[in-house]
């Protein structure tokens, strides 16, 4: 992976990342294709309608079904999905933690029960990389020990100890596998844990900074803490993060979260919010968000957002979308998802432009002004 820090405006950064499958600028938002597809969309939508340069797939889900071996047989995620740009795969640890009842965390890994058939599995630092080698993802995430917030200081310390231990195991294993010709062209990111505890976050960041990861992620946020505490945690981490590696805030978040954390030096984001909210009838716009199911939109000839150039806003009215939603027409999911993802990707583009023009502060002021804040 090639990484270039191109420009800074305060702590906000524009970087260029090149993988084996695409080159993209940051700040970047990565649409989430949990099971190998962004819900209701296909590779053509992602490339030609949205021009997404990188998307995320989930190791937990793809490992359980169709299995990593099946994906490998199709030539990895790129051959399986026909999306020929970059893929980032998470380790599956979050889903093992959140979807599996009675998951157990040990120093060896995470034992969990499949939400599909109840079978038991063990994720270890090595096994999650083995699955991601099969996927041939461009960026692989290591296994980390996530805790729900609030958590006791003792549990947070255990989480950081395990995450550092697993990071060492993962980076050593990855280098050994590359020496054997496996994982060539695949990159590996470490994940910083520590809850909202300043000292534990710092300890984890400093430890992972010493390891030869291609990038560093901030995990374990947006899991119950107040937004202000998340922003403070990210800002406090900034001095301890290597400036010459990508910074990825996992699972975040709202448009406001993206703006606030870009201001604090974050480069990469992913979240299911644009597509999940789309399926529930909620649209993100330059002036805030609203739900299309309200009666006021039944005879509304206006498009979702007059300033938007997405496929949906170029072609369809609020009245039509209101009808599709109430009729439970599957077409609605695609049209709504196209709009919301276009909004997020365009937000990232506008932030890049503002940073390059040294006008991010003004951009942020206008962003909130349009929302009446």
From Swiss-Prot:
Active site: 90 (proton acceptor), 270 (nucleophile)
Region (RNA binding), start-end ranges: 251-257, 275-279
Cofactor: Zn(2+)
GO biological process, one term: tRNA-guanine transglycosylation
Superkingdom in the source lineage: Bacteria
Residues annotated as binding substrate: 90-94, 144, 193, 220
UniProt cofactor note: Binds 1 zinc ion per subunit.
Function per UniProt: Catalyzes the base-exchange of a guanine (G) residue with the queuine precursor 7-aminomethyl-7-deazaguanine (PreQ1) at position 34 (anticodon wobble position) in tRNAs with GU(N) anticodons (tRNA-Asp, -Asn, -His and -Tyr). Catalysis occurs through a double-displacement mechanism. The nucleophile active site attacks the C1' of nucleotide 34 to detach the guanine base from the RNA, forming a covalent enzyme-RNA intermediate. The proton acceptor active site deprotonates the incoming PreQ1, allowing a nucleophilic attack on the C1' of the ribose to form the product.
Complexes and interactors: Homodimer. Within each dimer, one monomer is responsible for RNA recognition and catalysis, while the other monomer binds to the replacement base PreQ1.
Family to which this protein belongs: Belongs to the queuine tRNA-ribosyltransferase family.
Protein name: Queuine tRNA-ribosyltransferase
Originating organism: Campylobacter jejuni (strain RM1221)
């Amino acid at each position: 992976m090639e990484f270039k820090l191109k420009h800074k405006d305060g702590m906000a950064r524009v970087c260029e990342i090149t993988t084996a499958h695409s080159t993209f600028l940051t700040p970047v938002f990565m649409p989430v294709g949990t099971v190998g597809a962004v819900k209701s969309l296909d590779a053509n939508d992602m490339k030609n309608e949205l021009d997404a340069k990188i998307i995320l797939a989930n190791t937990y889900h793809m490992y359980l079904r169709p299995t990593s071996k099946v994906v490998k047989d199709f030539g990895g995620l790129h051959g399986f999905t026909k999306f020929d740009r970059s893929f980032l795969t998470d380790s599956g640890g979050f889903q093992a933690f959140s979807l599996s009842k009675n998951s157990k965390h040990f120093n060896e890994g995470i034992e969990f029960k499949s939400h599909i058939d109840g079978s038991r599995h063990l994720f270890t630092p090595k096994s999650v990389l083995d699955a991601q080698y099969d996927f041939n993802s461009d960026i692989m995430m290591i296994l980390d020990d996530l805790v729900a917030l609030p958590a006791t200081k003792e549990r947070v310390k255990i989480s950081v100890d395990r995450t550092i231990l697993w990071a060492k195991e993962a980076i050593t294993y990855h280098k050994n596998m590359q020496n054997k010709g496996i994982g060539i062209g695949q990159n590996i990111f470490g994940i910083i844990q520590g809850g909202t505890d300043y000292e534990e976050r710092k300890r984890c960041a400093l430890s992972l900074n010493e390891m030869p990861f291609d990038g560093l992620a901030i995990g374990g946020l947006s899991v119950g803490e107040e937004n202000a505490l998340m922003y403070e945690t990210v800002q406090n981490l900034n001095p301890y993060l290597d400036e010459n590696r990508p910074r990825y805030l996992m699972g975040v978040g709202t448009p406001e979260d993206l703006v606030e954390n870009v201001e604090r030096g974050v480069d990469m984001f992913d979240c299911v919010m644009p597509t999940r909210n789309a399926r529930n009838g909620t649209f993100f716009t330059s002036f805030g968000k609203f739900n299309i199911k309200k009666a006021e939109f039944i005879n509304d000839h206006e498009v979702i957002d007059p300033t938007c150039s997405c496929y949906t806003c170029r072609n369809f009215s609020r009245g039509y979308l209101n009808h599709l939603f109430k009729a439970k027409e599957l077409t609605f999911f695609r049209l709504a998802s196209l709009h919301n993802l276009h909004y997020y990707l365009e937000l990232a583009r506008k932030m890049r432009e503002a940073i390059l023009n040294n006008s991010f502060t003004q951009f942020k002021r206008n962003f909130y002004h349009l929302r009446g804040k």
